[in-house]
Swiss-Prot record:
<dbReference type="GO" id="GO:0060452">
    <property type="term" value="P:positive regulation of cardiac muscle contraction"/>
</dbReference>
<dbReference type="GO" id="GO:0030659">
    <property type="term" value="C:cytoplasmic vesicle membrane"/>
</dbReference>
<keyword id="KW-0851">Voltage-gated channel</keyword>
<dbReference type="GO" id="GO:0001698">
    <property type="term" value="P:gastrin-induced gastric acid secretion"/>
</dbReference>
<dbReference type="GO" id="GO:0060372">
    <property type="term" value="P:regulation of atrial cardiac muscle cell membrane repolarization"/>
</dbReference>
<dbReference type="GO" id="GO:0015271">
    <property type="term" value="F:outward rectifier potassium channel activity"/>
</dbReference>
<dbReference type="GO" id="GO:0090102">
    <property type="term" value="P:cochlea development"/>
</dbReference>
<feature type="modified residue" description="Phosphoserine">
    <location>
        <position position="407"/>
    </location>
</feature>
<feature type="binding site">
    <location>
        <position position="242"/>
    </location>
    <ligand>
        <name>a 1,2-diacyl-sn-glycero-3-phospho-(1D-myo-inositol-4,5-bisphosphate)</name>
    </ligand>
</feature>
<dbReference type="GO" id="GO:0005770">
    <property type="term" value="C:late endosome"/>
</dbReference>
<dbReference type="GO" id="GO:1905515">
    <property type="term" value="P:non-motile cilium assembly"/>
</dbReference>
<feature type="region of interest" description="Disordered">
    <location>
        <begin position="61"/>
        <end position="80"/>
    </location>
</feature>
<dbReference type="Pfam" id="PF00520">
    <property type="entry name" value="Ion_trans"/>
</dbReference>
<dbReference type="GO" id="GO:0031625">
    <property type="term" value="F:ubiquitin protein ligase binding"/>
</dbReference>
<dbReference type="InterPro" id="IPR003937">
    <property type="entry name" value="K_chnl_volt-dep_KCNQ"/>
</dbReference>
<dbReference type="GO" id="GO:0030644">
    <property type="term" value="P:intracellular chloride ion homeostasis"/>
</dbReference>
<feature type="transmembrane region" description="Helical; Name=Segment S3">
    <location>
        <begin position="191"/>
        <end position="216"/>
    </location>
</feature>
Length: 673
């Protein structure tokens, strides 16, 4: 079966079963350098165009007339595999390409110099344990009762470590070539001049010298090379090759340099003065043994350092009460300043950790913000009729489609790569059986109207032949290898024509793209809001307090605007304040003025009515106080001063009344109608 589907290895190698050289330089280079050419085989059952390889001279190909007679059984196995037009992919081999040398260098360099992941952690932690065990045995070799045990074991451990560190140094030097600044001999020398590389080289050379000079397996036999033992302790620096510890310490010291300098300066002044005054008080004092403990200023400085650093050896003690008083006073003052740098550094480290956490939280917001900006811009650009807005949704025609389609009409194919891979994976088919199990169908847009049912026999490719071991396909019955839902999904993907130009986009395409972009915008907005959520309780409290402060400011501003527009409520202001507030332009003051005017108009209307009634009664000659002839029981008001009209009633008054005059007194029952 396998022999029938693929040519032999020797024949494959001879007739170009591997890469297709020269394909990147056009079809001319492909025709010159490739042992076989690609011929367009037309007249298939579906009218589609397929490329089939033409074999070497004397070997019948798929288009040769002798092909059906050469192997009848092979003709029933199904269609031949399509020839890939990608020059980087082999026709008969699907093996992964070999990793490039620079790629391997980069992976090794990242593994050694930029450790990330659990594998790197395990490796570097194992190296740390080995170095720590070697250091412990080095310490035990200096103890007399463990010399015999530790020295022999240490000798072999030193040999293993020298070989290991030497090999690792060479590998590091080789893998550094993946970076542009370390390429070549001068680049390697630049890498070797790094401080940590120099330390590694010194450790390897020192260990080699110790092993070479040592005799009879004794690592530290001679006293001449015992000084090199310190260089072997430098292996502990190998643990932190990236120098993150020193960078962190340096950044903390640099940030708090002013506070550290201040405390150290004042503490140093306290040390000098306290030592000097104690020396003056104790320079002639003699202890119980008859010796002068503070015979020089250097002895006093030593006592001061031991005292202010809270060590207290007790080798020098003040003898006089004057010296003890001076020592106690200055000790309290100086010890407090010498203890401050530890607290400053501790708080600096805590702030640094918090700053890194904030930076991590902020870095998580950057991709979300970028995605939100991008989606917002795309939503805005969707309203622009420019063609560049829609080019990202247009599929570029591949080189294989350009070669397979001689006519300008586009073709549709069932071979959807992702769906095919999923179906093959679900069915558990081997690579040699995939081409037999999945039918290859090509659809022509010109005959799309006359196309029968998609699930009928005529709608499938007749090139699917039966296989005695996989499935039986006859012309009268169609055998399904997939579920109905998968066939529907496959049908939905096959009926979609790829858009190759912006002009092919229709209004429903553009509307769908706008809807998708708007949905992407809402999703990106939600993710950005989730990324901006605070991660600490203190941040939550700070955010709430800041929000409460902003809310109070807004409420006060709103209250001020309401007071300016409406005015203060009448229940909370006195009469004098109302008088003062009447001249303002608030709504309340305007309403008060309107009410005053309405009251004044009401009074004038009543006055005019009384005057008209008096004039009417005088004109008719009636007695004062008599009823009007019209009846109605209304009594006419009597004229003032014996029939004369008060002229003050006709005087116009434009002056506004006071607030106390605004209230009209209620009429009694006798003043009614």
């Amino acid at each position: 079966m396998a022999a029938a589907t693929s040519p032999p290895r020797a024949e494959r190698k001879r007739w170009g079963g591997g890469r297709l050289p020269g394909a990147r330089r056009g079809s001319a280079g492909l025709a010159k350098k490739c042992p076989f050419s690609l011929e367009l085989a037309e007249g298939g059952p579906t009218g589609g165009a397929l490329y089939a390889p033409i074999g070497p001279p004397g070997v019948p190909g798929p288009s040769s007339p002798a092909a059906p007679a050469a192997s009848p059984a092979a003709a029933d196995l199904g269609p031949r595999p399509r020839v890939s037009l990608d020059p980087r992919v082999s026709i008969y081999s699907a093996r992964r390409p070999l990793l490039a040398r620079t790629h391997i260098q980069g992976r090794v360099y990242n593994f050694l110099e930029r450790p990330t992941g659990w594998k790197c952690f395990v490796y570097h932690f194992a190296v740390f344990l080995i170095v720590l065990v070697c250091l412990i045995f080095s310490v035990l070799s200096t103890i007399e009762q463990y010399v015999a045990l530790a020295t022999g074991t240490l000798f072999w451990m030193e040999i293993v470590l020298v070989v290991f560190f030497g090999t690792e140094y060479a590998v590091r030097l080789w893998s550094a070539g993946c970076r542009s600044k370390y390429v070549g001999i001068w680049g390697r020398l630049r890498f070797a001049r790094k401080p940590i590389s120099i330390i590694d080289l010194i450790v390897v050379v020192a260990s080699m010298v110790v092993l070479c000079v040592g005799s009879k397996g004794q690592v530290f036999a001679t006293s001449a090379i015992r000084g090199i033992r310190f260089l072997q302790i430098l292996r502990m620096l190998h643990v932190d090759r990236q120098g993150g510890t020193w960078r962190l310490l340096g950044s903390v010291v640099f940030i708090h340099r002013q506070e550290l300098i201040t405390t150290l300066y004042i503490g140093f002044l306290g040390l000098i003065f306290s030592s000097y005054f104690v020396y003056l008080a104790e320079k002639d004092a003699v202890n119980e043994s008859g010796q002068v403990e503070f015979g020089s200023y250097a002895d006093a400085l030593w006592w001061g350092v031991v005292t202010v650093t809270t060590i207290g050896y007790g080798d020098k003690v003040p003898q006089t009460w004057v010296g003890k008083t001076i020592a106690s006073c200055f000790s309290v003052f100086a010890i407090s300043f010498f203890a401050l740098p530890a607290g400053i550094l501790g708080s600096g480290f805590a702030l640094k950790v918090q700053q890194k956490q904030r930076q991590k939280h902020f870095n998580r917001q950057i991709p979300a913000a970028a995605s939100l900006i991008q989606t917002a811009w795309r939503c805005y650009a969707a309203e622009n009729p420019d063609s560049s807005t829609w080019k990202i949704y247009v599929r570029k025609p591949s080189r294989s489609q350009a070669l397979l389609s001689p006519s300008p009409k586009p073709k549709k194919s069932v071979m959807v790569k992702k769906k095919k891979f999923k179906l093959d994976k679900d069915n558990g088919l081997s690579p040699g059986e995939k081409m037999l199990a999945v039918p290859q169908i090509t659809c022509d847009l010109a005959s799309e109207e006359q196309r029968p049912d998609h699930f009928s026999v005529d709608g499938c490719d007749n090139s699917v032949k039966k296989s005695p071991t996989l499935l039986e396909v006859s012309t009268a019955q169609f055998t399904r290898t997939n579920s109905f839902a998968e066939d529907l999904d496959l049908e939905g993907e096959t009926l979609l024509t790829p858009i190759t130009h912006v002009s092919q986009l229709r209004e429903h395409h553009r509307a769908t793209i706008k809807v998708i972009r708007r949905m992407q915008y809402f999703v990106a907005k939600k993710k950005f809001q989730q990324a901006r959520k605070p991660y600490d309780v203190r941040d939550v409290i700070e955010q709430y307090s800041q929000g409460h402060l902003n809310l109070m400011v807004r409420i006060k501003e709103l209250q001020r605007r309401l007071d300016q527009s409406i005015g203060r409520p009448a229940l909370f202001i006195s009469s004098s304040e109302k008088v003062k507030d009447r001249g303002s332009n608030t709504i309340g003051a305007r309403l008060n003025r309107v009410e005053d005017k309405v009251t004044q108009l009401d009074q004038r209307l009543e006055l005019i009515t009384d005057m008209l009634q008096q004039l009417l009664s005088l004109h008719r000659g009636g007695t004062p106080g008599s009823r009007a002839p019209g009846g109605g029981g209304a009594q006419v008001a009597q004229p003032c001063s014996g029939g004369s009209i008060n002229p003050e009633l006709f005087l116009p008054s434009n002056a506004l009344p006071t607030y106390e005059q605004l209230t009209v007194p209620g009429r009694g029952p006798e003043e009614g109608s």
